[in-house]
Design a protein with these regions (language model features):
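Helix-start (N-cap) detector for alpha-helical repeat units in TPR-like alpha-solenoids
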Residues: 24-25, 58-59, 92-93, 126-127, ...
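Position-specific recognition of the canonical hydrophobic site in helix A of tetratricopeptide repeat
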Residues: 28, 35, 62, 69, ...
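Canonical tetratricopeptide repeat
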Residues: 29, 63, 97, 131, ...
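TPR/TPR-like (Sel1-like) alpha-helical repeat modules
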Residues: 307-344, 352-356
Length: 356
């Protein structure tokens, strides 16, 4: 339906509402058309008018709750979901939506409670088990997350979301071979999935399988989509395998892909610092500083390079800049004080020797 047809449908429905102001079907129809036109303020207004006619319209309560949920107005969402629960305490969608809302609010006990209530009414939906797994995943209980992802897959063996997330959980549990097993399944089902190709490549890198690792990075880069992250991950792998020149070139490609992002410059600087090319490292960090002028950690990185290159006075100035930006950061202060004390001690030692 194009814009012109949509406007005609809206006009026609408004006319029907004028003729039958208590017919809630017309309100649902008008709300649907406004939603198709992305006029969500009008959708809300129509639904609120509908509730004045029928305060127990379950679909309206659920729809309003969902609109506020996706607007990240979680307290407003809960208001309507709670009303929906009073209207129909046996509707699993009510509990599922409440659980999702509490999950966004990081309220683990209530989210888990309402997911379990959802299962009381719908125990065969893999998406509910996925959601519970994700809840445990977010709260870093990877063992429980794994169990629920496996339950989701027992109900839907080709559920791509569960396969990817289960691979991620296995990776975090250091079960890299199992992670690869799930990633490979996804890539077989969706060979154009760039993210999964990267997951496979990164896992192969951890497993020290250089040849296959590089092969999957090349596959990921060849797939459509932004390659900034792919170049960075590939560069890190190249660096880990001591292919430093290739790594440096990949960081350059990452910069070309997104010149306004500092991370590639910082990682490139770290690479040069690790191989003792301090001037090159300094240059990369200063490029990052042009993007994030007020980021104290970059000043610390520059200071570290100066210190390793035996430019102690310059390192002191950079450490002090970081401390001035984050005076509450004890780590910055401790490093600054230690370097300053060492510098003063060396300076005085020279004076004492000269006096003799």
């Amino acid at each position: 339906m194009d814009k012109k047809e949509l406007n005609k449908a809206i006009e026609k429905t408004v006319l029907k509402m004028a003729l039958e102001p208590n017919n809630t079907e017309h309100y649902h129809e008008l709300a649907k058309y406004y939603a198709m036109d992305n006029q969500y303020e009008k959708v809300i207004s129509v639904y609120e008018s509908l509730l004045e006619i029928d305060p127990k319209d379950l679909q309206t309560l659920l729809n309003l709750g969902s609109i506020w949920f996706y607007s990240k107005e979680y307290k407003k969402a809960l208001k309507y979901f709670n009303q929906a629960m009073l209207v129909n305490p046996s509707n699993y969608l009510v509990y599922y939506n409440m659980a999702n809302t509490y999950a966004e609010l990081k309220n683990f006990p209530k989210a888990l409670h309402y997911y379990n209530r959802t299962l009381d009414f719908n125990s065969q939906d893999p998406e509910v088990y996925n959601a519970i797994a994700l809840l445990y995943h977010d709260f870093e209980d990877y063992v429980e997350a794994r169990a629920y992802y496996e339950k989701a897959l027992s109900l839907d063996p080709e559920n791509l979301t569960a396969l990817v997330d289960l691979g991620n959980v296995c990776f975090k549990l250091f079960d890299y071979n199992k992670a690869l097993e799930y990633y490979y399944k996804v890539f077989k089902l969706a060979p154009d999935n760039k993210t999964v190709a990267l997951c496979i490549a990164n896992t192969l890198a951890v497993n020290k399988d250089k040849e296959k690792c590089y092969d999957y990075f090349e596959k990921a880069i060849a797939l459509p989509g932004d390659n900034y992250k792919a170049y960075i991950c590939y560069a890190i792998a190249k660096s880990d395998f001591k292919d430093y020149e290739d790594a440096a070139e990949l960081y350059k490609k990452a910069v070309e892909a997104n010149p306004n992002e500092a991370n590639a410059y910082i990682l490139s600087g770290n690479l040069y610092s690790n191989i003792k090319k301090y001037k090159e490292a300094e240059a990369q960090y200063k490029e990052a500083l042009k993007i994030n002028k007020l980021e104290p950690s970059i000043y610390v990185l520059i200071a570290n390079v100066y210190y390793m290159n035996n430019e102690i006075e310059r390192s002191i100035y950079s450490y002090r800049a970081a401390v001035n930006m984050r005076p509450e950061n004890d780590e910055y202060k401790l490093v600054f004080i230690q370097v300053l004390d060492d510098f003063i001690e060396d300076y005085r030692k020279d004076d004492i020797i000269a006096a003799f």
